[in-house]
Swiss-Prot record:
Keywords in alphabetical order: Aminoacyl-tRNA synthetase, ATP-binding, Cytoplasm, Ligase, Nucleotide-binding, Protein biosynthesis
Binding partners and assembly: Homodimer.
One Gene Ontology MF term: ATP binding
Aspartate as annotated region, ranges: 196-199
Stored PROSITE patterns: AA_TRNA_LIGASE_II
Catalytic activity: tRNA(Asx) + L-aspartate + ATP = L-aspartyl-tRNA(Asx) + AMP + diphosphate
A Pfam family it matches: tRNA_anti-codon
One GO cellular component term noted in the UniProt record for this chain: cytoplasm
BP-aspect Gene Ontology terms: aspartyl-tRNA aminoacylation
Gene3D superfamilies: Bira Bifunctional Protein, Domain 2, GAD-like domain, Nucleic acid-binding proteins
Enzyme Commission code: 6.1.1.23
Residues reported to bind L-aspartate: 172, 218, 457, 498
Name of the protein described by the UniProt record: Aspartate--tRNA(Asp/Asn) ligase
Length: 602
């Protein structure tokens, strides 16, 4: 019987006999004495086997990396000069008396302590990958976060209620994963993109405070922070306004960070959406980076420089500057790389001015400003740019000029890139936790492709008080009772006050060009139940995967999920998704127009 975990044996167990079980992390033969580092989920302990115990010595001699062993022995101090203060077990070792080989192991595809393994190799051999200490730590922290959330919400009076995994398809922005019904041929369930409607119905049912930690599914193009199946900390409350909900969930975030990382997050400032977009080009600004946009659209309306003037005069156009302290030292190569980078976001180029001498702001050859564009701008404009940005000698000013969406995304991404690469050494990046709330989101945004307004969050978000009439008369300026929790440039949670009156919900659907017939067909069960005395209610959902990714400092969300999918939505461990046989398809009344092999060949 195991008496101790390997990584938890300390000096308090000196001279005691212990039994540990685990994997051979490393084996060394030192002139007739064998050393084995035995590993389990709690860490590593050093085991010494000498020839005086011949059976144990023979077992140790046959063992190789990743063999599974049971070892019984006496705990003793390590010899002087061989201790490791970074480990709980670093001052002791076990002198083995008995060793049992519980299982042999094939040679693993990579060493457990090898940090230079490609992600494809890791995901194909995920079980071995999960033995690595960093992965063990990540998933243990994930567990701690989930348990901390449960403890906090339980104490706040929330009830854990499960909602269905098989439900109806309702449009929420991304494509649904569909599940064909065998019992109802030609009909489909959908895996939920969120428990949104069910949690609202639980409020109508009178449960007052609900939560669950649940899987959600979205069939969308994947990025570093997205998975087709992801875990959501979902909650909903009745009779609370947005300030009260934000206070509760802010308290939860603070408690979780304190318990898991011993970090005090402090208070969360609140920033209107319009301010976030104006100064940072993003609704999830990374406040560790002290760089802001400077608005120049008005100034460029009277300039002759076509690139800036064209954007300033364009409907929905924008011209901004981004001052980077000490950036004049950027090389031509670095600026070219930044130009390519903003091109990813649709920018056609990246204009810049290096500030060498603020005392000479002419646009002539002797100008204190260095740039190909200086000669195209008036001296008045140059002086105004320097004044507005507060630029000093040695700075560089980057410019964005295009549709506001392109400018915001391109220069916003540049702000992050420059800030992370150069901010620490130049004083405009602080490596700390910077949370905030972004509030006062627009209710709708215009979808040029669909030629109509769509919901920014989802169509069940309530309009800001006094904005109900704007939903139809001026949807572009209608604000929502929505709020996002942002941490270091990541949206880790988003929520809103919901619509609790059927007539208001019908007006929102109408503003989104959803006909009464379509409303009833897709959302009739919601509209019908809102008529039975639905309480005012609202909530929030946290992305558990994103939150843990931030807390661990992992490079990818895939590093905090036990068995994730690739960016092509595949599981390399099990080779899912996979083809199914014709019999299974016939049972589901399905016939494929194109076989999987044909699709891959095409």
């Amino acid at each position: 019987m195991r008496t101790n975990y390997c990584g938890l044996i300390s000096e308090q167990y000196l001279d005691q006999t212990v039994t540990v079980k685990g994997w051979v992390h490393r084996r060394r033969d030192h002139g007739g004495v064998i050393f084995i580092d035995l590993r389990d989920r709690e860490g590593i302990v050093q085991v010494v086997i000498d020839p005086d115990t011949p059976e144990a010595f023979a077992a140790a001699d046959s063992a190789r990396n990743e063999y599974v062993l049971s070892i019984t022995g006496r705990v003793r101090n390590r010899p002087e000069g061989t201790t490791n203060d970074k480990m709980i077990s670093g001052k002791i070792e076990i002198l083995a008396k008995e060793i049992e080989v519980l299982n042999a192991a094939a040679t693993p595809p990579f060493q457990i302590d090898d940090e230079n393994i490609s992600e494809n190799v890791r995901l194909t051999n995920r079980v071995i990958d999960l033995r690595r200490p960093v992965m063990q730590r990540n998933l243990r922290l994930r567990y701690q976060v989930a348990m901390g959330v449960r403890r906090y919400l339980d104490a706040q009076g929330f009830i854990d209620i499960e909602t269905p995994m098989l439900t109806r398809s309702t449009p929420e922005g991304a494509r649904d994963y569909l599940v064909p019904s065998r019992v109802h041929p030609g009909e489909f369930f959908a895996l939920p993109q969120s428990p949104q409607l069910f949690k609202q119905l639980l409020m109508v049912a009178g449960f007052d405070r609900y939560y669950q930690i649940t899987k959600c599914f979205r069939d969308e193009d994947l990025r570093a922070d997205r998975q087709p199946e992801f875990t959501q900390i979902d909650l909903e409350t009745s009779f609370l306004n947005e300030d009260e909900i934000m206070d509760i969930t802010e308290g939860m975030a603070k408690q979780v960070f304190k318990d898991a990382l011993n970090v005090d997050l402090g208070d969360f400032p609140r920033m209107p959406y319009a301010e976030a977009m104006f100064y940072y080009g993003s609704d999830k600004p990374d406040m560790r980076i002290n760089l802001k946009f400077t608005e120049l659209t008005d100034l460029m309306k009277t300039e002759e420089f076509k690139v800036f003037r064209g954007a300033a005069d364009m409907k929905g156009g924008r011209v901004v500057a981004l001052r980077v302290p000490n950036g004049a030292k950027f090389s031509r190569k670095e600026i070219d790389e930044y130009t390519k980078f903003v091109g990813i976001y649709g920018a056609k180029g990246l204009a810049y001015i290096k500030v060498n001498d603020v005392g000479n702001l002419s646009n002539g050859e002797d100008s204190g400003l260095q740039s190909p564009i200086v000669k195209f701008l008036s001296e008045n404009a140059l002086k105004e740019i320097i004044a507005r940005t507060g630029a000093e000698n040695g700075d560089i000013i980057f410019f964005g000029a295009d549709k506001a969406k392109v400018v915001n995304e391109a220069i916003g991404a540049l702000r992050i890139k420059v800030g992370l690469e150069h901010g620490a050494e130049n004083g405009y990046f602080t490596d700390e936790w910077k949370p905030l709330w972004v509030v006062d989101f627009p209710m709708f945004e215009y979808d040029e492709e669909a030629d109509r307004y769509v919901a920014v969050h989802h169509p069940f978000t309530a309009p800001k008080e006094g904005h109900e009439d704007l939903m139809v008369s001026d949807p572009a300026n209608c604000l929502a009772r929505a709020y996002d929790m942002v941490l270091n440039g990541w949206e880790i949670g988003g929520g809103s006050i919901r619509i609790h009156r059927a007539d208001v919900q019908e007006k929102v659907f109408a503003a989104l060009k959803i006909s009464p017939e379509e409303q009833q067909e897709k959302f009739g069960f919601l509209l019908d139940n809102l008529k039975f005395g639905a309480p005012p209610h609202g909530g929030l959902a946290f992305g558990l995967d994103r939150l843990v990714t931030l807390m661990t400092g992992a490079e990818s969300i895939r590093d905090v999920i036990a068995f994730p999918k690739t960016q092509r939505a595949q599981c390399l461990l099990t080779n899912a998704p996979n083809s199914v046989d014709d019999k299974q398809l016939r049972e589901l009344s399905l016939r494929l127009r194109q076989k999987a092999a044909e699709t891959k060949e095409a």
